[in-house]
Amino acid sequence: MITNGRSISRRTFLKTTAGAAIGAALPSLFYNPAFGNTRRPVREFHFTAAKTSVNLGEGLDFVAWTYNGQVPGPEIRVKEGELIRVVLKNNLPDGTTIHWHGIPLQNAMDGVPAITQSAVSPGNTFIYEFEARPAGTFLYHSHAGYQLDQGLYGSLIIEPLKQEASYDREYTLVLEDWVMRDNGGTADTRRRPPQNMMHGRMGRRRSPGPSEGPLWEPIYDGYAVNGRVNAAIEPIIVRKNDKVKLRLINASSATIYFLRLAGHTL
């Protein structure tokens, strides 16, 4: 077992995680050298990466790679400045990591395999620990191979210590393009977007709609909002004059979305 890049014994690991419920966020208070010479509350989350049969609300079930058996993975919601501990157990057949997209971190916690850390091997455990800064809406995901496309992603919400504006309701919308086939499809159907369509690049694939230009491939089976497609997407319910905060996360491999709200101007 591994924590902070170092091997630890099973007994030590069990001592540090005893009483933690799988998938739950448990506040605790203890001394941890990784966080400095102080006692501060730590928000602890437990993730298991594993293959899971899923259905996005339409079509047949298929095998995705998930955190805690769900797509997207569990939302992590913390306050700015809180300390986060994520215990990742890898039950997948391949090595995996968690990258905290947009969060400035020391290399050991950044989750880029073969660059900032070794991938967590099948059957092993790794502990990520870092301070929740800055406030904002972020995406966490595997940075190994096509694992994000296979379902290993979720939202990280860091609430500011002081709200800049008031609102009545809040929704987080995670957008994803899906090849709804076991393990992301075969070698012939797996997502292989050109380099200029990858994360952080100016991809040309627009959804949903006709292909535009030479960069339209690959074709996806569905476009999901919070893990649901088409008619299965849950509507946003609001009252007249409500002030609504939308947190938008694009976890797609190669899709740009044009968003509309009926009767409203964006």
Predicted feature residues:
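Acidic-aromatic/histidine active-site loop/patch
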Residues: 172-243, 249-252
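Bacterial N-terminal signal peptides
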Residues: 23-25
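C-terminal segment of classical bacterial N-terminal signal peptides
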Residues: 27-31
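N-terminal secretory signal peptides
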Residues: 1-8, 19
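Histidine- and aromatic-enriched segments that form or immediately flank copper-ligand environments
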Residues: 40-163, 218, 254-266
